[in-house]
Amino acid sequence: MKLGDFDFDLPEELIATRPAVPRSSARLLVAEQDRISDGRVTDLLDWLAPGDRLVLNDTRVIPARLSGQRHRNSAQGPVSARIEVTLLEPQADGSWAGLLKPLKKIKIGETLRFSDALSAELVDVVDGQGRLRFNLAGDDFDAALAEAGAMPLPPYIAAKRPADEQDKTDYQTVWARNSGAVAAPTASLHFDEPLLKALSEKGVTFTYVTLHVGAGTFLPVKVEDVTTHKMHAEWGQVTPEAAAEIAATKAAGNRVIPVGTTALRLIESAARESGAITPWEGETDIFIYPGFEFRVADALMTNFHLPKSTLMMLVSALMGQDRIRAIYAHAVKERYRFFSYGDASLLIP
């Protein structure tokens, strides 16, 4: 299975840099068996049935991009350097792993100041990543980070414009509650309160799970034989309550539909050992590509993904490679907007 099998031509202008307003007005491509329909996210009301269960990732994106100043005394007097930091994940010892640019301009033991309230000491460097120990913790840290940090927009958006205050709302789901992600579960960005209310009134049910999306989600696949690719690991949790709700839906013969690839990867991770959904917590590096046997997901709502990405491989596993090629060719022809701030698809195998 070759990397080129998952490539396609995407015009640059179809990469969205801002989301649709309101959220649920984004376009929705529905692929069911051999049919393709074009509509809006609000049309989910026509495609979902009473008893269907949407699985939603409730992770909260942290404003993980920080710009700091390093101060140092030299023979010529005080000197400073600007260091850009992208926080990656908290460590067991209370420090944070992060990407520091340029790393060569700061030494272990030196301090970065991000604002009057927030600073951090570089305590170690591991595999090219800095380990930062902040001066604050808990709610005080969260508040200072919210003030000093910017949203960690994906590289293909950040290359076109800097993050701004609007992104702190736009790049967050309306139900986000468990902080820890450095990328959003972007299919979920299409939901607003009116749509959730309308779906609930129709009899669609919701289950919340948590997968803290990491920066590794944007890493390119560098091997030609995709089956040898090593996935990054991300922390996730399916609570006993969530597992019971999903199991009950399956037992009743109704559909379980994850919203986003993160929710899908998590619930399939939770079913890997027994074949059925069970409570689960830990690091998952599940890699889903054609040939994968889905045990929980009956369909998937997801955005349109990058060529040659692991997420293109995932949707190809669900729908079949030829089918996905046709779906994506249709999306390009009809000028759907792609990637994190783009439009959505509902894939029903």
From Swiss-Prot:
Which compartments is it annotated to reside in?
Cytoplasm
For this UniProt record, the keywords arranged alphabetically read as follows: Cytoplasm, Queuosine biosynthesis, S-adenosyl-L-methionine, Transferase
Relate the protein's function as given in its record: Transfers and isomerizes the ribose moiety from AdoMet to the 7-aminomethyl group of 7-deazaguanine (preQ1-tRNA) to give epoxyqueuosine (oQ-tRNA).
Give the UniProt family note. Answer: Belongs to the QueA family.
Q: How does it assemble?
A: Monomer.
Q: Which residues form a coiled coil?
A: none
Q: Which gene encodes it?
A: queA
Provide the protein name: S-adenosylmethionine:tRNA ribosyltransferase-isomerase
Say which domain of life the source belongs to.
Bacteria
Which GO-annotated molecular functions does the record name?
S-adenosylmethionine:tRNA ribosyltransferase-isomerase activity
State the reactions this protein catalyses: 7-aminomethyl-7-carbaguanosine(34) in tRNA + S-adenosyl-L-methionine = epoxyqueuosine(34) in tRNA + adenine + L-methionine + 2 H(+)
Q: InterPro entries under this entry?
A: QueA (IPR003699), QueA_dom1 (IPR042118), QueA_dom2 (IPR042119), QueA_sf (IPR036100)
- The keyword NADP belongs to this UniProt entry's keyword annotation: no
Where mainly found? cytoplasm
Q: Give the organism, scientific name.
A: Ruegeria sp. (strain TM1040) (Silicibacter sp.)
Entry's Gene Ontology cellular component terms: cytoplasm
